[in-house]
């Protein structure tokens, strides 16, 4: 394990630990022995890449972790269906399934052609797992209806989808997310909040709230000038919702939105730090979405990929991306950007697509932070030479010092399904805390040609690791 101080760009090697997690069922081809196989793609329909799973989200409560992901990714939009997998032993073993009554490829079949953008949350008050996604009626038109599938048996099964908001004419719903208020002392305990944007109306934000375990949803009032392509809402211990968003072409920085009335109304935007990012090579589909979580004391931590610390003079601006961090106590005021010192500033390593989790049993100077990300050892690579790996950074002192390790890789970007925006591992992935351990869920693969409509071409699946902290 490599331990680094956040205030220094010097790496101090003090020993290496091998973290292992057992796999459930037959191991996927080429899977590393220290990873658990979360799920594999069973679909063989025409029009999608087979044996592909991308874009996993995950959430945890107690000793249970649930992950949702696209299964059978297509070139134009979405996937054959949304899969889920559940672990009741902190990520050691997994049991998977696929949502019913969603797409025409589901069992039983549903009405949508594809599904995309999966996210998952647990509602402790009502004892319900909620898997949210976009149901896409036709491709290549990518938008669709926002829906949630419910599980009342601890993610052993999921029911038919409940539509949160159907997409209307001249709308393009995209980049949804979901979170639930699980603090028993919160005045809004049991509220769940769903978010998405409308690409046909200047990326206007939409929020919706459920207070009955996802059975019914009511629309929130969001300022008419809102503009963002996705983001991650979190909930402070007192019930305030803080929604950090990615504005794309709207502004030069992230923005946050606040609800203090249980999701009835939102105020904002509040300015977050500016973005300074570098495009990723290797024909890989990468966005600069923020990832946020909150500690037990109510501090919000938001991470993203940023190259501001790789500026070495004229002609050498923004050479490679780091993972950076900003914090807030109220969602309105944000700290200066801090570089997570994964590698020296002079290195050629490019880091991107980060996700953060904070152990809710910790806070402040003792907060346990887990950040998972993808990286290239050499940023200036191409489709044939880019070596993609999964990295993990952890801190047990609120971000003052960090321990670094590699979880998986290297992979070639060409092993992953090609989309209209490049080869895809996902626009996001995630990590959760279970019993004080970090459990990231991510996409791995082995060599394949990933030709469209070729049943045996790809070898891409979801995997996890269980990582003790401290």
Language-model regions: role of each:
Residues 3-17:
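Bacterial N-terminal signal peptides
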Residues 21-470:
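C-terminal PAP-associated
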